[in-house]
Structure formats: C-alpha cells, structure tokens
C-alpha cells in the first residue's frame, strides 16, 4: 500500500510555498525531496509521529494575473482532490476571507475528502481572533499557524495524521505487485496494458485510479497477481504549457509512489528524453524496482548488433541506475509482450530478496580476501560483520571500525560483489556502514 498523499491548496500569496519549505527543512524528519521537471520542488517525503506520507507542493500552480485566479484555483483544487488522501486548505489570516477561498471550499466540500483548514500568518496571540470568520467556509474548525515563524505546525500535522489511522495504515497489506507504466504520451503505455489484459483470462476488475488520467487494472497470471497503473498524462490543450506539464508530472509521480516496479517505456524511433531521465530518476531516488522497455521495436531497421548498440546508448543516459533491466518489445505486434510481466516479477523478486546472514558474511569475507580495503588517511577499513536489515530495496549494514574509512570505490566494489553473487538486477541496493568498537 502506498504512502498517504497530503496536498497543500490555497490561493496565491497565502503562504503555501513558505509552509512547504518550512516542512521540508528537516523539521518533521523529511526523508527526501526531489525537484520535478519544472524548477519548483513538487514532492517531499515526510514523517510525523511515525506516520510516513508524501507532501505535494501545489505552490507553482498559480495564476500570473488576477483575472484568472478563480479558474486557476479550481484546477489546483481539482488536482488535490483527485490525488490526495488529506488536503491542507491554507488561507490568509491577515487578509481575511476572499472569494477565491469560498470557491475552493465549495469544491472541497463536494469532494468528501478529509480537509484540514489552516489559517496562516497568525504571528501573534492577539491575531487568533482573525480565524473566526473562516468558520463560514463550512470546512470545520481551523488550525492557526505562522508558517514563517514555524508556530502551530505540530498541531496542524497532528490533525493531518489523524486521518491516516483508519484508512491508510490499519488495512490489510495488498499482496498484488503494483506496476506503474511511465513515459511520454503516445509511447504505447495504454497499448501495452491492453495487450497484457487481452492475453490474460483472469482479469478481476478495472477501477478508476487515484487520478483522472490513471486507470488501475487488476490481472492474475502464472507469474503472480498484478495491479497495472497506466499514467496516460494530460492531453488537453492549454496556453500555459508549464502548468499542464506540472499537472502531468504530479500525476506521474503519484503513480510512482504507489508502485513496486516502475516500467519506463521508450519509443524506439525517438530514444530517451530529458523528461524520461528525470521521471525515472525519481523512481530510482525513492528506491523502486525498475524495468526499461523499448517499445515499437518493429519500426526500427536493424541487424544483429542494433539491440546491443541501442541498449549501450540507453545505459549511458541512465548511468545512475546500472542495475536496470531492459526489454525490447512491440505492443502493436505482440513481440516479446509475454515477457513483460515475467520480467517485472523478476525485478520484484530481487527487490524483495533476503540473503541469509551466514552466506552473506562468507561472500564479503571472500571479497575482502580478494581485495583488501585501501588505507584512508592513516587507517584501513575493517569489516567485522554484515547483515541485511530490510527489503524494497535490499538494505545491508556493515559493522566496521570507522565508517569514515570507506572509500567510494571500495563501496562500489562491495556492491558489485553482492550483485555478482546474489543477482539484484532490476533493483538498487543500499549499503550502510556503522561503527562497532573492536573487542
């Protein structure tokens, strides 16, 4: 089950970006934040009271002129309604209630989504009375904060995580493997999914996904049970291209969040784009299993060396994830389509693989004998013991004399030894080094 998503909504200049940046300033144990395709930050991984969740920064979706405030706010609220599990509705306690606030509140009431009404810019105790007029929005009791001074943020987050308890964390873990198909429009994502569904007889159901442009399809196969997440992307025309791009990116990121395995689809006739690199880079950063599929392979003139050459070029462009698996298919003709879910399952199996501690230490001991750690400064790294502490991705702790002695080249050597011995293709692995005093 994916982490809950929390979106911050509000008209321009109420302090959305200030609030987001304050929360992303390590004040609530941010795990990671990632720039999107646009220059604005879009996502931040957060934790509060042991609840992990994802924050969406909708601060960049703002009108440039006042005459389109209401229409823009309607779109922004719609994005939050579609994607978020909980919505923070931010209003300005200094300026007071505005027509745009009422417009958004009306949409939020209809959505039936949990909303935490937050009155910002309450910098002093005497300003508390400014919050009362916001009861007229019919959203519930407001929480007062000052995002610039970091006042009241704990109370606000307490209210937010209250909504997680029943729906997000107490449910049974879904045993299905979630696969997100990501890539540019018209690369063949929907065609491939339709092909997969058409060839499998045991389809459970099709249900609307969390976003207007995503559809979840459930399918059972001999390789396992899967949820196929199609991120179609926005196709409607708009004068503001960056705004539409941002909507599309947010939707794609939401699908990545929910996925175990991310399949990046590339058009063989076009190659990989900068946006492809950034989107799959996000999946890499948050430790998803990854499969790269080159579609429309039937349209490429080729000889016996073409595939190897194409794969080599892809690996150069995706050098930050050398572990990725590759598959060349044609969704149109069905070429190698039968291997898609099988290969995705292989990625998932490696993503969730556990290695016995005894075998693990034998491999590392042998690796040390073959190549001794280098001296860093005046000390040489000593590795006493290794154990695996988690999966998704496989995570290993090395107990050593001094973590500062680990050289990046030797860390890469240890990772390569683990990969050669245990096959972690399709998934990243994490190596952590912890000091243990020699007895």
From Swiss-Prot:
NAD is among the record's keywords: no
Record-linked InterPro entries: AAA+_ATPase, G_ENGA, GTP-bd, GTPase_Der, KH_dom-like, KH_dom-like_a/b, P-loop_NTPase, Small_GTP-bd
Stored CDD domains: EngA1 (cd01894), EngA2 (cd01895)
Domain EngA-type G span(s) in chain numbering: 4-168, 177-352
One record GO biological process: ribosome biogenesis
Binding site for GTP 1: 10-17, 57-61, 120-123
Entry superkingdom: Bacteria
Residues the record lists as binding GTP 2: 183-190, 230-234, 295-298
A molecular function GO annotation: ribosome binding
Alphabetic keyword roster: GTP-binding, Nucleotide-binding, Repeat, Ribosome biogenesis
Assembly with partners or alone: Associates with the 50S ribosomal subunit.
Family stated for the protein in its record: Belongs to the TRAFAC class TrmE-Era-EngA-EngB-Septin-like GTPase superfamily. EngA (Der) GTPase family.
Function: GTPase that plays an essential role in the late steps of ribosome biogenesis.
Protein name in UniProt: GTPase Der
Gene (name only): der
